[in-house]
Amino acid sequence: MSLAGKKITVHDMSLRDGMHPKRHQITLDQMRNIARGLDAAGVPLIEVTHGDGLGGASVNYGFPAHTDEAYLSAVIPELKQAKVSALLLPGIGTVEHLRMAHELGVGTIRVATHCTEADVSEQHIGLARTLGLDTVGFLMMAHMSSPEQLVVQAKLMESYGANCIYITDSAGHMLPDDVTARISQVRDALKPETELGFHGHHNLAMGVANSVAAVAAGANRIDAAAAGLGAGAGNTPMEVFVAVCDRMGIETGVDVFAISDVAEDLVVPIMDAPIRLDRDALTLGYAGVYSSFLLFAKRAEAKYGIPARDILVELGRQRLVGGQEDMIEDAALTMVRAREVVA
């Protein structure tokens, strides 16, 4: 099936998911510079918050260089055509955080839950719709649920008022057939006017292929990040995805060369380490582990001498999900004790 002429919305993640590899330490000037570049390149939607969403600043998730309010206040006035979104995880972000974001000019709120827990999003989705926001239900770790189970959860979020639903490959574990099955069944189940999106990670180098599969199956919003700046091996690299879309005739409205310049000249220079598919990031995708666990596992390796890969495999075995970052330390300690017993 030809996708030529299909229009999609690309949504940049480099200033939100990109907070994870930066340990939430992106400066206000870096935020402004990258946001201006994305805006000029034609990116229509840019996400800006702590890596774990509004209210994410904590011992568990990490303290950012600046508050969400400061980041949003720095970026929003700089934009000429792009709009700003914010992520909110119920239990981390509150309705007061949501109101704050709205007052500062955020136009899109993405309410994120684990893929089996859509019922905890009702209050936040309902308020976002009442405030007139573009309201997105964001189902994380979607590889852990069957297409049929995702349909049930997506319809719950739609019933609460979400005008767009996201199928989110938080672990970068899916292959194109997995994406096709989930996106197509959810697309068939939702109202025709409800939009559908896909968020990928590049932990098996499938970010671009999975995103194209999502578009072919009916998604019209696709997350990506300039230079792939995001958790794990990064998000779908925006400049590559836009170039592939251009080759296929999919209309993104983003200039290929301009977004490539943003990636190369603005994003790559702020990386603490190259965003690449190393053995630990590969393990995230292979074992189906939440991408933002990568740095936690590397810190545990440095502290306890247990290889990060072994820790990540154990986290996958335990089927840990976002919000259980404290269990990474527990898993590492258990492995240390087991090693001592063997010795």
Curated annotation (Swiss-Prot):
User: Can you say what this protein is called?
Assistant: 4-hydroxy-2-oxovalerate aldolase 2
This protein's record includes keyword rRNA processing: no
In which domain of life is the source organism classified? Bacteria
One GO MF term, please? 4-hydroxy-2-oxovalerate aldolase activity
Q: Which PANTHER family match?
A: 2-ISOPROPYLMALATE SYNTHASE 1, CHLOROPLASTIC-RELATED (PTHR10277:SF9), HOMOCITRATE SYNTHASE-RELATED (PTHR10277)
The record places domain Pyruvate carboxyltransferase at 8-260
What are the protein's UniProt keywords? Aromatic hydrocarbons catabolism, Lyase, Manganese, Metal-binding
Q: Which residues bind Mn(2+)?
A: D17, H199, H201
The yes or no answer to whether the keyword Lyase is present is yes
Q: Name one GO biological process term.
A: catabolic process
Which Gene3D superfamilies has this protein been placed in? 1.10.8.60, Aldolase class I
| NCBIfam families associated with the record | 4OH_2_O_val_ald, PRK08195.1
Family under the similarity heading: Belongs to the 4-hydroxy-2-oxovalerate aldolase family.
- The site feature described as Transition state stabilizer is recorded at R16
Residues at the active site: H20 (proton acceptor)
Q: Which residues bind substrate?
A: R16, D17, S170, H199, Y290
Which EC class is the enzyme in? Answer: lyase
Per its UniProt record, what InterPro entries does this chain match?
Answer: 2-IPM_HCS-like, 4OH_2_O-val_aldolase, Aldolase_TIM, DmpG_comm, DRE_TIM_HOA, PYR_CT
In terms of Pfam families, this protein maps to:
DmpG_comm, HMGL-like
| Reactions the enzyme catalyzes | (S)-4-hydroxy-2-oxopentanoate = acetaldehyde + pyruvate
EC code(s) of this entry:
4.1.3.39
